[in-house]
Amino acid sequence: MASPHSPSHASASFLDALDGGPRLPADHPPIETGRVGVLLVNLGTPDATDYWSMRRYLKEFLSDRRVIEVPRLVWWPILNLIILTTRPGRKGRDYDTIWNREKNEGPLKTVTRSQAELLAHRLAEAGDRLVIDWAMRYGNPSIASRLEALTRRGCERILVVPLYPQYAAATTATVAD
């Protein structure tokens, strides 16, 4: 029997949970079950390091009421007249120092994609019944676009997994919104 900490035990437990119980005996007749999507969600990253890409990303991120809890009447001029005119250039230069040039993307996108690919590989025994994908709360690929893609791929249920280490309204709650 596999150790409770072994990879095969972990994936078997996960698959059991999806099925609603323990695995069936080998001689049991097949049971049709629908596809399940697992969507890993991380915070986000701009599409590029140029001024307009950074501005678009910062506007989406800093317009979220869960992230900035200042009254809109006060926040709108600060965001649009100060932050979005001065910060995109500076933040773009900062991002440029850590940008993944090989894939032309931010490091968080690279890491999140890799996590989804590794999870899909580890859970491959589920066959095409389990579909793993990933999204960004701010930026691309968006949660909405990936939920739509999972639905098009025939997923009857979708489990959304925020990749944050703890609960906070500005992170986990905004994914659920």
Where are these regions (language model features)?
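Active-site-proximal alpha-helix that buttresses catalytic centers in soluble enzyme cores
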Residues: 2-177
